Structure formats: C-alpha cells, structure tokens
Amino acid sequence: MPRRREVPKREILPDPKFGNVELSKFMNVIMEGGKKAVAERIIYGALELIQKKHPDKDPLEAFTVAINNVKPMVEVKSRRVGGANYQVPVEVRPVRRLALSMRWLKEAARKRGEKSMAQRLANELLEATEGRGGAMKRRDEVHRMAEANKAFSHFRF
C-alpha cells in the first residue's frame, strides 16, 4: 500500500462486441502473456457456445448471473493474537468480490476436461448460473471456513 497518495484506478474500456466493462475485465483475467486476441477468442467462443446450447438464454446475462453467483460475501484472514494465529472472518470488499469470482471461474475452467478452453469456460459459466461447478465449490468452501471461524469475528481488523 502506498504511503504517500492513493493510486488512481485505471479505467477499463468496455469490450468491442457487447460493450460490457465486466466482460472486458474478465478478458484481462483470462489473458496470459499479453495475448488479448487469444483471450477475446476464448471468451467470445464460450459465449457463442452458450448461445448454441441454450438459444433462449442471453449469453451476456448468463455470464453476469454466473459472476454474481460465484462472488464471495465473506472470507477469512489470518490474524496473530498473543502468539496464536486466528482465521478471522471478514466481509469482502465489492472490487475484490468481483476479482475473486473472475479468478475462480478461470481456474475452475482450466481444471475441466473438455477439449478447448472456450468449451471449458462455457460449461463452467453454465454450471455457475445453476449454482454448481468448481467455482461455486470454491466459494462455498470459503464461506464454510468463515462460518466455522465465526467465533473469532470479534478480532476484527
């Protein structure tokens, strides 16, 4: 954290196809080694696959629902008190909430067994809209940890 001044947030431009800022943030999360064109192809491919599988569903809406379902409300942070480390549950800030949900969706999609990354991502997003999948499992795990350590919530930061 800077001591002198607050670093200004960079403005992220909306993606070219849908004009959605969240989608372009997700594109940046998916991107590796500065290869934005590859990330773009993966994401748009996944959204097209969602459209093909469920013609009645809007793929952008499915993406938004998936992101919102995966967002964690609470997480645990380590806090040292009197020679012991406690896992203290804390509420997650909105910006971190979004970042974590995107990161978890990416990681869960990577671990899947489908052929292409677009297929993996499409299936992970569809499962997340239904409250299933690897990313949802991760969120539930984090929530369970926070629930288990509720007794230490008075050690707030």
Swiss-Prot record:
Keyword Membrane found: no
GO cellular component: small ribosomal subunit
Annotated GO MF terms: rRNA binding; structural constituent of ribosome; tRNA binding
Biological process terms in GO annotation: translation
InterPro entries: Ribosomal_uS7, Ribosomal_uS7_bac/org-type, Ribosomal_uS7_CS, Ribosomal_uS7_dom, Ribosomal_uS7_dom_sf
Keywords in alphabetical order: Ribonucleoprotein, Ribosomal protein, RNA-binding, rRNA-binding, tRNA-binding
Role: One of the primary rRNA binding proteins, it binds directly to 16S rRNA where it nucleates assembly of the head domain of the 30S subunit. Is located at the subunit interface close to the decoding center, probably blocks exit of the E-site tRNA.
Assembly information from the UniProt record: Part of the 30S ribosomal subunit. Contacts proteins S9 and S11.
PANTHER family in the cross-refs: RIBOSOMAL PROTEIN S7 (PTHR11205)
HAMAP family, sorted: Ribosomal_uS7_B
Family affiliation: Belongs to the universal ribosomal protein uS7 family.
NCBIfam families linked to this entry: rpsG_bact
Protein name from the UniProt record: Small ribosomal subunit protein uS7
Species of the source: Paracidovorax citrulli (strain AAC00-1) (Acidovorax citrulli)
Lineage: Bacteria, Pseudomonadati, Pseudomonadota, Betaproteobacteria, Burkholderiales
